[in-house]
C-alpha cells in the first residue's frame, strides 16, 4: 500500500473511533494487533483489547472529537499521528476520582500498517499533563508522606 493509503486507514480509524463505532475494529485491525502504551512495560495483544482500551477511556471521559490531526506523517509502513484532545473526566481513571475539570493534552500515536490493517501501535499520551490539569498530582511542598 502507498503511504497515502496507510494514512487513510489511520484517519478512518480515528473518525470512527470518535463516533464510537467499535465494529470498525474488525475491519481495520489485524487479529494479532500489538498495542504499546508508553507508560506500560508490556504490550497488549489482540483486537478485543483495542476495543476494551478505547471503550474504557471513552467511558471515563467526556471526549470532544478531535480527528483532525495536528501532524500526520507517513513513511513506508509507518504512520505518525499527533492530535490535541480535550477531555473531562466523568468516572474514575487510573485510580483517580473524577475531578470534572477539563484538560487539553497532546497525544502521539505511531501506527504500523500491513496490507491495509493496523498491526501495531505505539501510544504516547501526555499523561503527566493530563493528571496535572485534572489536579491529580501532589502539590510540591504540600506535605504528605
Name each model feature, range by range.
Residues 1-145:
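C-terminal and inter-domain tail/linker signature
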